[in-house]
Structure formats: C-alpha cells, structure tokens
Amino acid sequence: NILDISKDYTIFANGIDVTSSTTATNISGEVKLIFNKEYRYDATGNTSSDNISIVQIGELSSGGEEYDYRYLGETWGSPRVFRMPNEGAGDNNVLDDEYVAILTGGFGNFSHSIGSNVYVIDWLTGKVKKEIKIEDKAYDDNSKNDIINSIPASPIVITADSSQANFSGALVYVNDLEGKITKINLTNMEQTPEYDLLTGKFTTNATPINLYDKYTLFDVMASTQINNIYSYHSLDAGIGVRSKSFWLFGGTGDIMNLNDLQVDHNKVKNVMYGIKDFSYPFFGSAKTNQSPDNFLRCKNTTKDQDGSNCPDIGDRGWYINIDDQKKVVNEPTLTGNVVYYPVFKPLRGSKSCGDGKAYICSVDADCGTNLSKKLGTNEGAESNEECYYVGSGVLSKIVGFGTKLYANISGESTNKDKDDIVVIDAIDNGLINYRTSWRENY
C-alpha cells in the first residue's frame, strides 16, 4: 500500500505508467485506486490477471545525497574497479585519476525503477559519483516489450591497458534484463569518429562526447508475449582472430522459471548470439532518429555447421535459435576463438519439476558456426542434439584452463569419476580475450 499518497508515487498497469489517469484515495488508512478502464483480477489464479504495481521511493535527507542507493536492487553482479579520469573529456593527466567501482543496479524483482541503472562509485569513500539511468522500454504494439527492466548482470569493462586502445578510463558495456546492450563512456576521449559500413573504415567526421555519455548499442527485442528471452547473465568480450572485430557474446534464458511453468512453450525462443561493436576502440554514438540494431541486422547461423553463413563486414553479428525451450543458464565463456554456452533443457510431463538436461554449445566466435560436434559424440537419446550432452541439471559458468573446460553441475555429470563436475577437452582456434586481464577484473 501507499502509506502517504501526498508523496510522489507511480502506478503501473501491465508495465505502462497510468499514474496520470488514475485517482488514489486514502480512506481510514485504506488506499483505493480508481482507474479509467477495467483491469482483470482473479484471486484464484485460474485465469490470467492484469499486473498492477505501485512504486514509491522514500525521501532522502540532504546529508545522504552522496550515498543515494535507493534505486539499487539485489546485487547479483560483481563490481569492476579501474582508474577513471577525474576531469572527463580531455583529461590527459593520469596521475590524478580516481579509483572507481562500476556496479550494475542489480535484480529489481520486477519492481519498476529499481535496478535499471549503473552506479559509478568512489572506491575510497563509497560515495555515488554518478547514477546512470538505463531506459526501461515502454510497451508498444510492435515490440510488445512487457518486461520490467533491471540489470542483474556484471558489467563488461574494457580499459586501454587490456587492449590496444589509446585512452584512459574505460568503455563499459551492460546488458539488461529486457535484452538491451548499453555502451557507456567513462574515458577521457573528447570526440569519436563514425564507422562507415560501406567502406569498413572510420570517417574523418567526429562527434564530441562527454564523460557518462551512453547509448543503446543493440536490442534483442524481448517480450513475454513473443519469445520470453530474458538476459540475466553477463556478456563476454573479445577480438575475433579472423574478423579482427570487437565482439560481445551473450545468451538468453529465464533462470527464474527454468521449466517454463505457466508459460506458453511455443513462446519460449531463446538465442545465443555474437554482436560486433563497429565503433570500437572509439565510443561511437546512437543513430539519429533510428532504433538500435537488432537481430534483423545479423546472420541467422542456427543450422550452419561449415561456416557458409558467416556474417559479412556490414552485418552486426550472428545469432542461433535454441530449440525445445532450451535456455542459456550462465554467462558464456570465450577461449581459443570459441564461445561456450552452458545450456539447460527442461523436462516435461510428470517430471516437469525435475533437473532437466545439461549441454555445452560451442560456437565459432567470428562466424557463429556450431562446433559442438568437436566436443564429442552424443549417443542414444541424445544423438540428435546439436549441442554436447554433459549430464543432468544446471551448469555453472564454464571455465577454460589450458586445454580443458570445467564446470559444476547441479545434477549428475557424465564424467564417471566426477559426479558434480564436468571436465571436457576444449577446442583450440585462437582468440584474444579481454576478460582475462587482471586490470579489468581486479
């Protein structure tokens, strides 16, 4: 309930702000809402109800403004620490750069305004230097985006120390629950050139940029009415050996509902994908009067096993549709120019609450080609699966070490002498991987 309707509040109906068309009254301590249209509610849960929510953020005293974490959700992700230029654009004096932590807003538990942000925090004092709001897309009849946004995933932080770029500070990439990838400028760059898709080169025209600038780089176009492609886990990043492009790799899956209970299974259409950032190592900018790129700008490599459908220079990237309501259950891992995805296949019927099956999908980083057959041969009931079967249950993040891949599994592994650990040989194709730098992960 809203305890004090004299204070600011926001009312949402099915993800749409209806505050201006709703009247709230408080009679004897009981708050009543009067809408301008009828909404459905079934207390038995036998039929679908409309989703009505009220958000009211508590007031902040003047003494606590520098520690304003009111919009922080459940912090599932890990902060990243680096040195940021304290004067922003044009600050070439690295001696007075400041240590900051980049923390995503966390899981908002589907509460509007909570967790859909990124905090830049003074590492020494804990004060909030900047709260960067990330858009929670409004519902429209085309995209049908009805997911309440937040950012449970860890950020991707790229410093010049971990790459061949020429700037101080970092370029930050965050992917949110509704599948947008946002690029944030925390460098000393003063301007950025534009990338020409026709020539594959940067133009001589430059656009001024400032510290804390951001724009949406990509959008997977998530909707519970169409595909149920939630993005809970972080991306991985690296330079493709053949393309020489900077890539971001991700996967979708509703880990809060692994077996898709009370969900139309025909509307569960998860994906694995790789996206190029054409502007790297510069910041780039949003397209004027255009929507962010989506999978329409990418090659569908779902059935490609020989590289014949490799993305061209002007394609944004590649994507693979995952069948049988499978879902990516942890962040992908790059090693040896191959990206590895931990995948879960839910059981159906009488065992719909069971463990499900675990697979590792291996994909060529540059082309999106399915390389899973190189991991081993599936036998018996798994012989027709396109990814490599490794046991029952949910996989952890896959770790590459030497020539091996390691992962924990919640059920039973196919490794006979290691019940809850998966150990298999990796595929070696060579990759420059930025996630292994101590400067980025410290």
Regions inferred by a protein language model and the residue ranges of each:
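Beta-propeller fold recognition
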Residues: 1-6, 34-442
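Extracellular/luminal ectodomains and secreted, surface-exposed scaffolds of diverse proteins
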Residues: 8-9, 14-27
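A generic structural motif
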Residues: 29-33
